[in-house]
Amino acid sequence: MRKFLIISCLVLSFTYSQESPSFISGDANFYYISKLDGGGLIKLPYRILNLSWGHQHDQFQISSRFALEYKPQIDNYSFKMDNPQDFLLDLRELYMTWQLNFGEIRLGKQIQTWGFVDENSPLDNSSAYDYNFLFEAGTERKIASNSLAIDMYFNNFKIGPTTTPFHSINRLPSSFAEFPIELPVTPN
């Protein structure tokens, strides 16, 4: 709760400053997944609220994405989801961008996407996937990792090296989940 209050105060103080532009956007999702054969609810986690916030000052920008997630209580649901709460505030991204003449440098917890083929690219393995959100689109399925990324622009070309000290692994639903698709391999 204390972290939430500190983050809220920082967001409000940066948002209402006179000198630098800030933005806030988000959406609320009120939906559910039900079974076709009986109409019962499928107990999968989902994001009820998404919030994006950013603040720019000269060449520096700080960006963040928060999500309020509902996680059903199922025993041994997943090795990463062992929190006893139903609702969880998830800090999806928080990173700083330094914009330079030749490109930009980003440092922090961020979701990496590479090009237009983000959905199916075999090269796009810098951010892990959360298969509990398999039916979401784009970056909503990805897990952010602490990383340093540089985007350099040369005429019509873009070079983007990235490095991360800790690589996140894909998050798979366990065999106890009510996942509608059978996975070919499940972790022990």
Give, region by region, the residue ranges found by the protein language model:
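Outer-membrane beta-barrel biogenesis signature
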Residues: T15-S25, G38-G40, I111, F166-H167, ...
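Transmembrane beta-strand segments of Gram-negative outer membrane beta-barrel proteins
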Residues: Q18-D37, F60-S64
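Outer membrane beta-barrel
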Residues: Q56, F60-F179
